[in-house]
């Protein structure tokens, strides 16, 4: 796999080149994890295009997993709901993993409907709507984070130079991403992308402020404070995918394994959680092992700004 630079780069070009170079010799051994989860935030009318209606969004994660593993020509139990914004990213991902000969592992952390393909079942119920300020039980957050850290360390011990690719499908997840980023003290309103052609920034921000306020985490300027407890923020307004993925990053990248977070705003929230949870002294080494990769559509989306979001994240940590 050529170590070519991405089309759009946010961050240091030399660091990106070094990360790509480190992965180039071992990309055929990449571990691919697709993390499925659910949040009742997806039932808010108008919040997402990952399914045309709140009811259809219940099986979007299952449909994405089945499309990724089986492909568009196969008979699948859960047909992908109509998507007003266009083609599912799962179709693109299927083409990529098929071409590269990679074998994704699907992990269900609490999707509303389980996928009808082989998968690892770690799920409970979907998270509550983030506007409640009680999205997840704190014990569940701690359990998923610890599980991710142990799993990440095991993967690093098995293949320290083999890349780990973490992908997700969480309908409503860009809103939980905005909520977590905001709760951690980042000004990201209007910067977060979504599945809709025109992200509903006002609705997202209203839900985020309601959730953080209900949890007692809303500070001046509509954000969390600089010393916000990341686990408290995650329990208040996050989703299960974020907890496990942050643990995987800390465990795998912390042990020196390259990690690619495949996504946009949702993976920015995972990365922010990982940085907030690790010590300042360990952040530079962690950052050398982690990259976020997304599609050109997300990177260049006119109605959001992932590059600016990542710049603010980098300035914060």
Put a short name on every predicted segment.
Residues 1-167, 171-317:
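N-terminal loops that bind phosphate or other acidic moieties
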């Amino acid at each position: 796999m050529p170590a070519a630079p991405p089309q759009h780069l946010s961050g240091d070009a030399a660091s990106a080149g070094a990360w790509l170079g480190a992965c180039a010799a071992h990309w055929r051994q990449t571990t691919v994890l697709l993390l499925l989860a659910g949040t009742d935030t997806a039932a808010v009318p108008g919040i997402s295009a990952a399914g045309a209606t709140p009811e259809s969004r219940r099986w979007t994660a299952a449909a994405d997993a089945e499309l990724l593993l089986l492909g568009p020509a196969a008979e699948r139990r859960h047909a992908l709901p109509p998507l007003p914004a266009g083609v599912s990213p799962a179709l693109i991902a299927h083409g990529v993993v098929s071409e590269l000969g990679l074998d994704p592992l699907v992990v269900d952390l609490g999707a509303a409907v389980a996928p009808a393909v082989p998968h690892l079942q770690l799920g409970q119920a979907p998270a509550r709507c983030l506007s409640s300020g009680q999205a997840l039980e704190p014990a569940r957050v701690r359990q998923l984070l610890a599980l991710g850290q142990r799993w990440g360390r095991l993967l690093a011990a098995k293949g320290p130079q083999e890349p780990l690719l973490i992908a997700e499908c969480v309908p409503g997840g860009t809103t939980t991403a905005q909520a977590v980023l905001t709760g951690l003290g980042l000004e990201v309103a209007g910067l977060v992308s979504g599945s809709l052609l025109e992200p509903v920034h006002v609705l997202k921000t209203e839900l985020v402020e309601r959730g953080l306020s209900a949890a007692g985490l809303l500070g001046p300027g509509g954000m969390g404070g600089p010393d916000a407890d990341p686990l408290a923020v995650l329990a208040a307004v996050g989703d299960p995918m974020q907890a496990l993925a942050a643990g995987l990053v800390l465990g795998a990248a912390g042990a020196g394994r390259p990690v690619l977070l495949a996504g946009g705003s949702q993976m920015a929230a995972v990365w922010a959680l990982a940085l907030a949870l690790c010590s300042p002294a360990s952040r530079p080494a962690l950052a050398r092992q982690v990259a976020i990769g997304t599609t050109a559509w997300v990177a260049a989306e006119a109605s959001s700004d992932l590059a600016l979001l990542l710049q603010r994240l980098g300035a914060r940590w």
